[in-house]
From Swiss-Prot:
Note: Heme 1 (or BH or b566) is high-potential and absorbs at about 566 nm, and heme 2 (or BL or b562) is low-potential and absorbs at about 562 nm.
Binding site for heme c: C42
Organism: Trichodesmium erythraeum (strain IMS101)
Gene name tied to this protein: petB
GO cellular component: plasma membrane-derived thylakoid membrane
Metal-binding as UniProt keyword: yes
Primary role: Component of the cytochrome b6-f complex, which mediates electron transfer between photosystem II (PSII) and photosystem I (PSI), cyclic electron flow around PSI, and state transitions.
GO terms of molecular function: electron transporter, transferring electrons within cytochrome b6/f complex of photosystem II activity; metal ion binding; oxidoreductase activity
Keywords of this entry: Electron transport, Heme, Iron, Membrane, Metal-binding, Photosynthesis, Thylakoid, Transmembrane, Transmembrane helix, Transport
SUPFAM superfamilies registered for this protein in UniProt: Transmembrane di-heme cytochromes (SSF81342)
Domain of life of the native organism: Bacteria
Protein name in the entry: Cytochrome b6
Cofactor: heme b; heme c
Positions annotated to bind heme b 2: H93, H194
Recorded coiled-coil stretches: none
Length: 222
């Protein structure tokens, strides 16, 4: 995997002696890839790339976004009109969000149609389904952050859906909104979910997902 010039360097030997870098590199580069693998098996990787773009562009916007009902929309407009390349960063964030959802759906169909969810890969499928739910949650929480008319009413409708559940419905609605009505507490909760809670959850399940794929390998043809 590494050139002879690199492996002969003192720095490489120092790290290899302590961390067995060469053994790790050999394991990565020698992993068997079935001959039936085609471009459709790259959809999961493309979904990951979209997530990384989301993370980078979202992190950049947190420097300027203000999660308050009075300043949220103005801060988004400031990003779009005043911040250098802010319009591009936010546009890429929106485009990659749509692309991530699309790639996730296509990846799910590919895995289902090729039987990649069958024994012994049931847990890999379960972690993928959990990540799909988290991805949709990203979309719901992120859609509200500009706190414009569309975002406000989207939050009001989405957070009101659980109200139809017997007994616990009103409790869930108040838990989501942070109050009996949609307001600052709701925006704060959605912002916290979108920028902190959900990224940690999806990172953990991604790690589990990739470790299981690494251990079990790519599923064979039907």
């Amino acid at each position: 995997m590494f050139s002879k010039q690199v492996t002969d360097s003192p720095a490489y030997k120092w790290f290899d002696e302590r961390l067995e870098v060469q053994a790790l590199a050999d394991d990565i580069s020698s992993k068997y890839v079935p001959p039936h693998v085609n471009i459709f098996y790259c959809l999961g990787g493309i979904t990951l790339v979209c997530f990384l773009i989301q993370f980078a562009t979202g992190f950049a916007m947190t420097f300027y976004y203000k999660p308050t009902v009075t300043e949220a929309l103005a801060s988004v407009q400031y990003i779009m009109t005043e911040v250098n390349f802010g319009w591009l960063i936010r546009s890429i964030h929106r485009w990659s969000a749509s692309m991530m959802v699309l790639m996730m759906i296509l990846h799910t169909f590919r895995v289902y149609l090729t039987g990649g969810f069958k024994k012994p890969r049931e847990l890999t499928w379960v972690t993928g389904v959990v990540m799909a739910v988290i991805t949709v949650s990203f979309g719901v929480t992120g859609y509200s952050l500009p706190w414009d008319q569309i975002g406000y009413w989207a939050v009001k409708i989405v957070s009101g859906v659980p109200d139809a559940i017997p007994f616990v419905g009103p409790f869930i609605v108040e838990l989501m909104r942070g109050s009996t009505s949609v307001g600052q507490a709701t925006l704060t909760r959605f912002y916290s979910l979108h920028t902190f809670v959900l990224p940690w959850f999806i990172a953990v399940f991604m790690l589990l997902h990739f470790l299981m794929i690494r251990k079990q390998g790519i599923s064979g043809p039907l």
